[in-house]
A protein has these predicted regions:
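RNase H-like nuclease fold core
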Residues: 145, 205-252
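C-terminal reverse transcriptase regions that engage the nucleic-acid substrate
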Residues: 69-190, 330, 340
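Structured nucleic-acid-interacting core domains from mobile-element enzymes and related host factors
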Residues: 183-211, 276-278
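Catalytic palm active-site di-aspartate
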Residues: 14-42, 68-80, 98, 144, ...
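Mobile genetic element proteins and their domesticated derivatives, centered on retroelements
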Residues: 1, 7, 21, 36-38, ...
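Active-site palm subdomain of RNA-directed nucleic acid polymerases
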Residues: 1-35, 40-42, 47-51, 57-64, ...
Length: 370
């Protein structure tokens, strides 16, 4: 595949930041490979030519082109394209696998709930120990939930991360919490990641932290939340306990901010290798004034003196090279809140609306869509 076209090859170049990605600088076609599963992105003519060439050499089991009413499946991800008022929208979901997962867990008739973990109490509601059989079930089920939370369900990332902290010594409360997450999934099987099909690329990066807000599970450690959007679609997210105790909320926010910058850099390196234009500086949205101050003026004499480490110099270099720019966002509109704390159904619904509004605004800006 990487043999030059002059020598009878396809002319693809292998990515240096992700060896599973290939890019053709002439046709602008992009390929993602995972073992024997291949996903190709390009125009119809080049895609057909590519698949015919691969089929002739290796004998493909099957291949499909994503079209209206003809979704494709890649690594259990269902990818669709739909026409909405003259605008093409891409969507990604795992609804079929999630539905089967619920059936396999024997919960096909479970009553749906509107929030996976509306407060912190349920996980601690029953301290009674679990049996060996229940312990095995918890570990297996949380493992499956982690897979879905990582690939297509950012809306359960925090809750799954939280129950994962209890795998060593789970209780009956852990079982209740896991069952509630499944009940939430049962009521949101139609959840999907969406983005309009536009020529340009808009990037949005959000970071947040919850400073020692869950001491029963995380002790004095804070939680970092990061969401990275491409044209309004989440392409990377994580909810993770910070490795060290932060002495203040400012320190926790700065740690989350620097983690977001690091994540963004990796994705931008890959995007640039694949021929995707990246507009600098990277705008990172945070709802903490200390985080904004840290990015704009990393100086030991500032109002947040005493919370720095080596990230100080690193962020200063990125700022001076105009690679990053911190933007203040209203806490009520900070979509990454769902990665750092338990939320009520009302707050969760509002943040999901804010997430979809970003994609709709991008569609309007580029295409005049709705």
């Amino acid at each position: 595949m990487t043999t030059p076209t002059a020598n009878g090859g396809m002319g693809f170049e292998q990515g240096q930041n992700d060896l599973c990605l290939f890019f053709n600088p002439i046709t602008l076609m992009r390929i993602a490979c995972h073992v024997d599963d291949i996903l190709a992105r390009g125009n119809r003519e080049e895609s057909t030519k590519f698949w015919n060439a691969v089929d002739a050499k290796f004998g493909l089991k099957e291949w499909h082109i994503c079209e209206y009413d003809n979704p494709i499946s890649y690594l259990s991800l269902r990818i669709k394209v739909q026409d909405r008022d003259g605008v093409d929208w891409y969507s990604i979901d795992q609804s079929q696998d999630l539905a089967q997962f619920i059936v396999d867990e024997g919960m096909a008739n479970i009553r749906p709930v509107s929030a996976p973990m509306p407060d912190r109490k349920e996980l601690l509601s029953n301290p009674k120990e679990v049996s060996i059989t229940e312990h095995k079930w918890i570990r297996s089920t949380v493992g499956s939930l982690s897979y879905f939370a990582t690939h297509s369900r950012p809306d359960i990332a925090y809750e799954v991360n939280r129950v994962s902290q209890c795998l060593e010594k789970p209780t009956q409360g852990t079982i209740l919490a896991v069952r509630r997450i499944i009940a939430y999934i049962a009521g949101t099987l139609d959840f999907q990641l969406e983005a309009p099909r536009v020529k340009g690329t808009d990037w949005h990066l959000y970071s947040d932290s919850d400073h020692a807000g869950d001491r029963a599970i995380n002790g004095t450690k804070s939680v970092t939340g990061v969401v990275f959007l491409c044209n309004g679609m989440p392409i990377h997210w994580r909810s993770k306990k910070q490795p060290a105790t932060s002495t203040s909320s400012a320190a926790a926010e700065i740690y989350a901010f620097s983690e977001a910058v690091r994540d963004a850099q990796v994705r931008f390196f890959i995007a640039e290798e694949m021929g995707i234009k990246v507009k600098y500086p990277i705008e990172i949205f945070i709802d903490n004034a200390a985080g904004v101050s840290f990015q704009r003026c990393t100086n030991p004499d500032t109002q947040i003196k005493g919370v720095f480490d080596l990230r100080d110099e690193w962020v200063r270099e990125l700022r001076n090279s105009k690679k990053v720019s911190a933007m203040k966002v209203d806490t009520a509109k900070n979509i990454v809140d769902m990665m750092t704390k338990c939320l009520s159904a009302t707050v969760r619904e509002r943040l999901m609306f804010e997430l979809s509004a970003i994609a709709r605004e991008i569609a309007r800006k580029h295409l005049g869509g709705t």
